[in-house]
Amino acid sequence: MRKIVINGGLPLQGEITISGAKNSVVALIPAIILADDVVTLDCVPDISDVASLVEIMELMGATVKRYDDVLEIDPRGVQNIPMPYGKINSLRASYYFYGSLLGRFGEATVGLPGGCDLGPRPIDLHLKAFEAMGATASYEGDNMKLSAKDTGLHGASIYMDTVSVGATINTMIAAVKANGRTIIENAAREPEIIDVATLLNNMGAHIRGAGTNIIIIDGVERLHGTRHQVIPDRIEAGTYISLAAAVGKGIRINNVLYEHLEGFVAKLEEMGVRMTVSEDSIFVEEQSNLKAINIKTAPYPGFATDLQQPLTPLLLRANGRGTIVDTIYEKRVNHVFELAKMDADISTTNGHILYTGGRDLRGASVKATDLRAGAALVIAGLMAEGKTEITNIEFILRGYSDIIEKLRNLGADIRLVED
């Protein structure tokens, strides 16, 4: 069993460079199946989710080369083999194979998605969209079988009953080679959707409106190869900004797109966090006299659900009381019980998190219950006096590229230990 060991209480300073966006690249890689030539991705994060996707692509027949942060994928040899529950179930984003395999082969058999347990994340919206485009869906045990083999996919007008990033992207992927026009209404607006649309358009797709609540896709017959740079990871950036405000004595966060973080930065400014925003970086000063605030997550451009957990340790430094309400994933509260082991004054009731700041944290043995909870525990461990041991760290390595090295470069006493 591997664990992360932190000796906390040290002031950190220096610079961190943000990697490519996890939530983009996990959709970009399956989307490449639609191309009929080589596609190269730049700024690919070194995370286990990418390694798993590469392994799946190779099992399907793709040729993949990786050097540094560049991923070169030749999808011409991909075969439509069933991808049963197993390797697939470790990935929430495995559902993007539904759209790409349907778009290329007219059918797909894929295990149901896994990832972090944050409460219901039904694929009903995905299936509704595929069915509107002419596919049939059936369950075979833990697998989902989709088919439009006889008639092919056709354009459709699709209204998303709930704003969903995954369903919006998946519908877009499936629609780019469908016959006719597809219109997605009440579409999600996240930057990662624009990133996927940019890749697909550079491959020859006709997508308009990505980043708005109405997306229009006119189907094309073929998609060609291209080269694409993954956008910076706004969630990683927000995580390190929180860390810098919590334990930093001056930390610069590089490769940041401020427009992707405006809602998050606004809440930090409400707390009294002092920072300087530049063209592609944010400098976070040493902080004092922070004020407790209330957080309520919302779809983009609101406060991102993926950032409420990494922000929580910083809130525990603030003076006063506050609440955190996650309207997206109601079960995103498991970090509360682990932070309480570190002597945090924090609790949860009826899905609401209640906290009182100002109490010093103490090192403890804690467990990462999901990706962003793990990030919160790393920040808390760096804040705490004494030693913190974090187990279940595979969740953390799923989404944070080179996290140990990046934190060591700031002066953190942190290491990965093999038991």
UniProtKB/Swiss-Prot annotation:
Catalytic activity entry: phosphoenolpyruvate + UDP-N-acetyl-alpha-D-glucosamine = UDP-N-acetyl-3-O-(1-carboxyvinyl)-alpha-D-glucosamine + phosphate
GO cellular component: cytoplasm
Subcellular location: Cytoplasm
Binding-site residues, phosphoenolpyruvate: 22-23
Gene3D superfamilies: Enolpyruvate transferase domain
Pathway participation: Cell wall biogenesis; peptidoglycan biosynthesis
Sites where the protein binds UDP-N-acetyl-alpha-D-glucosamine: 92, 121-125, 306, 328
The keyword Transcription belongs to this UniProt entry's keyword annotation: no
First-listed, main subcellular location of the protein, grouped into a coarse class: cytoplasm
Function: Cell wall formation. Adds enolpyruvyl to UDP-N-acetylglucosamine.
E.C. number(s) listed in UniProt: 2.5.1.7
A Gene Ontology molecular function term of the record: UDP-N-acetylglucosamine 1-carboxyvinyltransferase activity
Keywords: Cell cycle, Cell division, Cell shape, Cell wall biogenesis/degradation, Cytoplasm, Peptidoglycan synthesis, Pyruvate, Transferase
Protein name as catalogued: UDP-N-acetylglucosamine 1-carboxyvinyltransferase 2
Catalytic residue list: 116 (proton donor)
2-(S-cysteinyl)pyruvic acid O-phosphothioketal: modified positions: 116
Entry-linked InterPro entries: Enolpyruvate_Tfrase_dom, Enolpyruvate_Tfrase_sf, MurA_subfamily, RNA3'P_cycl/enolpyr_Trfase_a/b, UDP_GlcNAc_COvinyl_MurA
Gene Ontology biological-process entries: cell division; cell wall organization; peptidoglycan biosynthetic process; regulation of cell shape; UDP-N-acetylgalactosamine biosynthetic process
Origin: domain of life: Bacteria
Family to which the UniProt record says this protein belongs: Belongs to the EPSP synthase family. MurA subfamily.
